[in-house]
């Protein structure tokens, strides 16, 4: 989800943090049965909803302090989206949790009167580790699933967004059961200390390098993991499409949050003629969405810090700059930038960009685009603009990605009834809606035959 450099924090672990005691306390709560009743789960979710609605402005203020995130964007992605997830979960939770009996025909080999089915049980005590790019949503939407499933939860917000982390650490104890939900702030030492403990599930959103660290720690206790990672999400633009419409949708999806979105379009594959028109239309679309001067626009964000600014800035030399390219380190500002005639071996194509830079790579057509995509790690998302049903069928059948979107990038993650997650290097496991509850649950087989 964020760039594969772990924070270079050398600070000692907080002397007040006793991870073993913390996890032990939460385990005791879970063992006592407190988190299992449906009423407790619904009450916690309702309280979490109140946290969002009563502190909407505080959340937006913290996100602006940390990320210069525009208020409208903060409301949409970090308040309204989690509230919709909570509402969807509350509306369906009792139905999701109800035991699922097998049809009698499935029990033909068993004694008469036998019944069987499945039911969900909570896993126990879980750890959720969030990144900095959507520091509220990516911490608290997984929490919705963990609470819905009836677990005790340790939350670890990102230290790279300190104002948001501090706000969450202050508000969670005011709204949620402090014997069942705890927030631990801090950097690498605190996270390392937390990972040394035994959990019943670990949910991590971030980069693959740290994902491997999380998975190694989990292996010590045979703890299952969900890894929501990232990668270079490609866009294929077919010949003959409405390029102006494509440009508008790409500009919105790519440059919101200054490109710091795990499923943002990373690069474009298209033929040279379409590439030339697309670059011009993207300039028009960017000016329409973010004004001719995005630096002074209230709708355009900033890079999270100088380290990530330096990393993204180093990618600006690839290809030919069609427009953009301006930057200001003191303001951690990089303009929306489109690069054309980019070669596959250039720096901008070697890593997830995670910034407002969109390279366009020329391909001859669909066959070459599919080969290009399949020659690289499986992405978190793949986007296609085409009018051809055959092209859509071939993309679905001949490529692998966490999700595929035809015509509307990013939209799939807003649909609660769709699983959100990666495959291969882009992650494992999924969540949102019912899938969140299932991620934090064990689906247990139950069979019964009366003795009389």
Annotated model-derived regions:
Residues 41, 86, 150, 181, ...:
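Residue-level signal for inorganic ion chemistry
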Residues 30, 34, 49-52, 56, ...:
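Structural signal for hydrophobic packing residues in well-ordered secondary-structure cores
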Residues 105-245, 276, 363:
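Rossmann-like NAD(P) dinucleotide-binding subdomain of oxidoreductase/dehydrogenase enzymes
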Residues 19, 38, 56, 243, ...:
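Residues at or immediately preceding the N-termini of alpha-helices
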Residues 10-12, 209-343, 406:
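ALDH superfamily catalytic-core signature
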Residues 28-34, 128, 235-237, 267-270, ...:
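Short, well-ordered beta-strand elements within core beta-sheets of diverse protein domains
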Residues 2, 37, 333-452:
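Conserved C-terminal structural/oligomerization subdomain of aldehyde/semialdehyde dehydrogenase
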Residues 1-115:
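N-terminal Rossmann-like NAD(P)+-binding subdomain of aldehyde/semialdehyde dehydrogenases
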């Amino acid at each position: 989800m964020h760039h594969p450099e772990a924070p270079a924090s050398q600070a000692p672990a907080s002397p007040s943090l006793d991870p073993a005691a913390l996890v032990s306390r939460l385990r005791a709560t879970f063992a006592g049965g407190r988190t299992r009743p449906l009423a407790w789960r619904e009450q916690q979710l309702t309280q979490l909803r109140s946290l969002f609605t009563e502190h909407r402005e505080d959340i937006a203020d913290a996100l602006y302090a940390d990320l210069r995130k525009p208020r409208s964007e903060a409301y949409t992605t970090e308040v309204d989206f989690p509230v919709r997830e909570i509402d969807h979960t509350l509306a369906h939770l009792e139905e999701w949790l109800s035991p699922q009996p097998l049809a009698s025909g499935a029990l033909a080999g068993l004694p008469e009167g036998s019944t069987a089915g499945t039911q969900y049980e909570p896993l126990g005590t879980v750890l959720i580790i969030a990144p900095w790019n959507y520091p509220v949503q990516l911490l608290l939407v997984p929490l919705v699933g963990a609470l819905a499933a009836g677990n005790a939860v340790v939350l670890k917000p990102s230290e790279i967004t300190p104002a948001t982390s501090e706000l969450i650490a202050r508000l969670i104890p005011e709204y949620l059961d402090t014997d069942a939900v705890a927030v631990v702030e801090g950097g690498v030492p605190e996270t390392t200390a937390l990972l040394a403990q035994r959990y019943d599930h670990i949910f991590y959103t971030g980069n693959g390098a740290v994902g491997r660290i999380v998975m190694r720690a989990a292996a010590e206790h045979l703890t299952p993991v969900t890894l929501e990672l990232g990668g270079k999400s490609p866009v294929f633009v077919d010949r003959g499409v409405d390029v102006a419409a494509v440009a508008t949708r790409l500009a919105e999806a790519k440059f919101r949050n200054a490109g710091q979105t795990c499923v943002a379009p990373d690069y474009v594959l298209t033929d040279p003629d379409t590439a030339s028109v697309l670059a011009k239309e993207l300039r028009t679309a960017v000016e329409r969405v973010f004004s001719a001067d995005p630096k002074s626009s209230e709708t355009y964000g900033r890079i999270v810090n100088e380290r990530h600014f330096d990393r993204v800035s180093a990618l600006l030399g690839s290809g030919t700059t069609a427009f953009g390219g301006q930057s200001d380190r003191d303001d951690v500002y990089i303009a929306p930038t489109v690069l054309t005639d980019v070669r596959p071996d250039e720096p901008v194509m070697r890593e997830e960009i995670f910034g407002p830079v969109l390279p366009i790579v020329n391909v001859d057509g669909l066959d070459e685009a599919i080969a290009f995509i399949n020659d690289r790690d499986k992405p978190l998302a793949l986007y296609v603009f085409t009018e051809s049903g055959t092209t859509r069928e071939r993309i679905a059948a001949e490529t692998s990605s966490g999700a595929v979107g035809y015509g509307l990038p990013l939209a799939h993650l807003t649909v609660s009834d769709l699983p959100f997650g990666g495959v291969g290097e882009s992650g494992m496991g999924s969540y949102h809606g019912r899938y969140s509850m299932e991620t934090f649950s064990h689906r247990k087989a139950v069979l019964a035959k009366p003795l009389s």
